[in-house]
């Protein structure tokens, strides 16, 4: 829904021609994201942007007191899209806390699962969600002049993807009717199958654990995976040149379009896909094994690689508030004062964070979002890093570091070479992603396409290494461990849309503090306490408008393209709290009406009547259709047997367990 409100002289902006335009919720993403803007239509520019989220999630609250071994099962439920990334990161965290190193084969299987997740998620988002922003129908409604030019523009790589003109590419992206749109849906099915082969279930893995995996590794398993992978590799040989043609055309058709979604190059990548020959998950060695990841960790500031050291990256994490619905934790307990290497840990580090929710009415000039504001301290400033939607930061950091060289992939210092082998219908192909001039909307989307090919190439390497282990008889996939009474752990990886870290403190064998920090808090963060805007806000405000529609018919396509280029996933935005049991000892989210609070300490009709007798009316018990005899209506369907929930009262029922006593509809044991 979009609302437009002409602003009067009392707006305080100094410009009476500004128009407020709001998109809440944003469609074709995951979760509850609202974008509130002020637009100057005379100068075709977005003047101000606020990014909001209206639902609180607080896994950090109800993780307290849990068995640490349950952490990956719980945190995978943070998201229904990339839950496996959370499960993986949680297992990394537990591996460090328990001091366990998984067998090599187990880690190769994890890598194969994560690579399949990258292929699946990037494909379905790029082609079936983001692609709609560039399809023929959308362009005809927002930029008919651009579509007319596309009809007469030959696609430079027609021989590779089969589409003669740019307009043909746009038509192929039309939802449900477009040829490429439908093909991508079929491909996404195969990639999910690849994931399930390795980790049992998508998106919440059933065979992934600290210490390794429960997957039984066989030659047949790897063959089933590789059969699907090679079809995906062939698909990539069509997809990469097709998107290059499409995105290059927008630069040509709309001079100045590089300014859309442009922000200062502040990119964070925590690295992903471990090399088990080097990774032991010990904090003291994290710098070394972090640099051996198949996606290199790194912070890129103004195009320069600041660090690839995971220890430095970890110590630089700061969680800011400012415009968020939380109270500060200044003065509360410090869980970790020094890391295992003796380095001081800041109070605003996730290890020391306390989550103190404070619900209130949205005020765009003060508090307006449930998202916190993660920042990275470089020694001078708390930088509002973004992930470039995930792939842009991953490729940029990996390219600059120049550490990856496995044949299928090579980082050169200024680019990443992706070497795809011969497939059924096409010969070997080499793609090269070059560091772009800008960190903007189109380059985030372009990088997403290239990273799909990157993940496929990496998976080929992982499959080969896994087969080496199996053929050598090293088929162990899991290592035993013990949970310590006291301990800390941190895990770093890349969720599909960017940086992901989990931070855990164990006391008395239970979780004392747990904070997951996924990519969307970084990207969707509101303005922090230092007045620094979050990446969505920063990328949108100040950008030009190229849409041809007038104010009354304005769709905001350029704004939507910018926001979606980050691959928003709002379930990941911050650490959902149901209420806690009264004796649990944990704080629950305050509710305007405590008696309607989800997960109240007491449940059921009797409890409801006790709490609010003036509002409670007993309800007749409902019968489930087709479930046994129905009084006054004759027997149920043939062969159907009576089913009834047993209650504690049955044990003292003189009529026998098969003959239920009539109970009042409001009885406590109903």
Per-range role (PLM):
Residues 1, 669-670:
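Universal eukaryotic N-terminal targeting presequences
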Residues 2-612:
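Metal/cofactor-centered catalytic core regions of large enzymes
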Residues 622-630, 634-644, 648-660, 664-668:
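Structural preference for solvent-exposed beta-strand-turn elements
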């Amino acid at each position: 829904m979009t609302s437009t409100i002409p602003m009067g002289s009392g707006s305080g902006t100094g410009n009476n021609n500004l128009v407020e335009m709001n998109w809440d919720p944003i469609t074709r993403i995951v979760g509850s994201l609202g974008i509130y803007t002020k637009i100057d239509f005379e100068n075709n520019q977005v003047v101000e942007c606020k990014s909001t989220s209206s639902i609180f999630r607080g896994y950090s609250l109800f993780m307290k007191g849990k068995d640490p071994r349950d952490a990956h099962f719980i945190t995978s439920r943070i998201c229904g899209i990339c839950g496996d990334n959370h499960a993986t990161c949680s297992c990394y965290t537990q591996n460090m806390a328990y001091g366990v190193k998984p067998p090599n084969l187990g880690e190769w299987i994890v890598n194969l699962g994560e690579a399949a997740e990258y292929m699946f998620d990037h494909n379905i988002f790029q082609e079936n969600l983001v692609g709609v922003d560039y399809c023929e129908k959308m362009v005809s409604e927002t930029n008919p002049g651009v579509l007319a030019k596309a009809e007469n523009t030959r696609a430079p790589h027609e021989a590779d993807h089969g589409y003669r003109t740019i307009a043909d590419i746009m038509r192929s992206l039309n939802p449900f009717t477009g040829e490429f749109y439908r093909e991508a849906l079929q491909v996404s099915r195969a990639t999910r199958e690849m994931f399930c082969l390795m980790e049992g279930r998508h998106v919440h893995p059933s065979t992934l654990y600290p210490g390794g995996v429960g997957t039984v590794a066989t030659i047949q398993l790897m063959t089933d995976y590789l059969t699907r992978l090679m079809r995906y590799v062939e698909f990539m040989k069509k997809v990469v040149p097709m998107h290059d043609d499409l995105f290059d055309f927008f630069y040509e058709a709309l001079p100045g379009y590089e300014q859309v979604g442009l922000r200062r190059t502040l990119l964070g990548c925590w690295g992903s896909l471990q090399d088990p020959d080097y990774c032991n998950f010990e904090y003291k060695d994290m710098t070394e094994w972090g640099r051996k990841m198949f996606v290199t960790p790194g912070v890129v500031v103004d195009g320069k690689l600041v660090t690839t050291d995971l220890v430095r990256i970890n110590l630089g994490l700061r969680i800011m508030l400012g415009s968020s619905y939380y109270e500060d934790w200044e003065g509360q307990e410090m869980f970790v004062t020094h890391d295992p290497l003796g380095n001081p840990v800041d109070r605003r580090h996730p290890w020391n964070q306390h989550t103190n929710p404070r619900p209130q009415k949205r005020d765009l000039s003060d508090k307006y979002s449930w998202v916190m504001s993660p920042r990275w301290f470089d020694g001078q400033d708390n930088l509002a890093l973004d992930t470039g939607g995930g792939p842009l930061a991953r490729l940029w950091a990996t390219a600059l570091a120049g550490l990856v060289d496995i044949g299928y992939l090579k980082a050169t210092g200024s680019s990443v070479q992706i070497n795809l082998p011969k497939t059924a219908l096409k010969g070997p192909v080499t793609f090269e992603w070059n560091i772009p001039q800008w960190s903007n909307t189109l380059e985030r989307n372009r990088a997403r396409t290239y990273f799909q090919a990157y993940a496929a190439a990496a998976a080929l390497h992982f499959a080969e290494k896994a087969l080496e282990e199996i053929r050598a008889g090293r088929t162990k996939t899991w290592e035993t461990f013990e949970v310590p009474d006291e301990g800390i752990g941190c895990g770093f990886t890349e969720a599909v849309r960017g940086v992901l870290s989990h931070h855990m403190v164990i006391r008395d064998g239970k979780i004392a503090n747990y904070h997951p920090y996924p990519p969307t808090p970084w990207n969707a963060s509101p303005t922090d306490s230092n007045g620094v805007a979050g990446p969505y806000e920063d990328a949108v405000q100040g950008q030009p408008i190229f849409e041809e529609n007038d104010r009354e018919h304005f769709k905001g396509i350029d704004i939507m393209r910018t926001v979606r280029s980050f691959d928003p996933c709002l379930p990941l935005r911050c650490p959902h709290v149901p209420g806690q049991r009264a004796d649990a000892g944990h704080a629950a989210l305050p509710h305007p009406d405590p008696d309607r609070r989800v997960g109240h300490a007491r449940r059921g009709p009797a409890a409801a009547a006790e709490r609010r007798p003036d509002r409670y009316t007993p309800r007749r018990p409902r019968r489930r259709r087709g479930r046994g005899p129905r009084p006054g209506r004759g027997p149920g369907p043939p062969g159907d047997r009576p089913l009834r929930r047993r209650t504690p009262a049955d044990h003292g029922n003189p009529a026998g367990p098969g003959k239920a006593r009539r109970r009042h509809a409001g009885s406590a044991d109903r």
